[in-house]
């Protein structure tokens, strides 16, 4: 049985770690290299670095930050934000990223998923889906959660996997930043239709929420606020999950 992973998420804007509630009201949380090193030393399984300004403002992704992070941590990390071409992905992986995460660009050019997975393997190809509930289904949003794209999240997840996505990072926009817990139904529905690892994101406020997401079928639990605000340490988190019977490192 595969170990479940705990993944802190660093939202990076203009070279600093920030955390917003529902993609708004960003607060500065410091230098991404220092924050990444802290989580590595705490025992996180992986990291996700999302350049949340890149896609919206057409910025180049943060190559220098990626190079510096790769020098201080020895665990897998994923980089997303503003990856529009195969060349963008190549530069990030050469700079030290283990995986790249596509969101808006994959919706605009699904072929990019295939191109990256063929060159670097499915294990290096993550597709991030920002999903918002409408009745019994979920719609997909792009450009940092600002634009509805008129696609069903479950169908898009299946298509992304068929094109070569080796992992899906799924954020519930309804839950994001609320600290009320993951959208468990979204995780369960995705688990029924795709066979690649799922990273649950959006809404964690307690350790119980992390456990619920993993028990609902996610392979990894991503969180920001509870770790950035030092509500819980990584060792505390792992101890709680182990005691609950969740298979973690």
Swiss-Prot record:
Its EC number is 4.3.2.10. Pathway: Amino-acid biosynthesis; L-histidine biosynthesis; L-histidine from 5-phospho-alpha-D-ribose 1-diphosphate: step 5/9. Pfam families: His_biosynth. Disulfide bonds: none annotated. Its main location: cytoplasm. GO terms for cellular component: cytoplasm. One of its GO terms (biological process) is L-histidine biosynthetic process. IGPS catalyzes the conversion of PRFAR and glutamine to IGP, AICAR and glutamate. The HisF subunit catalyzes the cyclization activity that produces IGP and AICAR from PRFAR using the ammonia provided by the HisH subunit. PANTHER family: IMIDAZOLE GLYCEROL PHOSPHATE SYNTHASE HISHF, IMIDAZOLE GLYCEROL PHOSPHATE SYNTHASE SUBUNIT HISF/H IGP SYNTHASE SUBUNIT HISF/H. Belongs to the HisA/HisF family. NCBIfam families: hisF. HAMAP family: HisF (MF_01013). Heterodimer of HisH and HisF. This is Imidazole glycerol phosphate synthase subunit HisF. It comes from Exiguobacterium sibiricum (strain DSM 17290 / CCUG 55495 / CIP 109462 / JCM 13490 / 255-15).
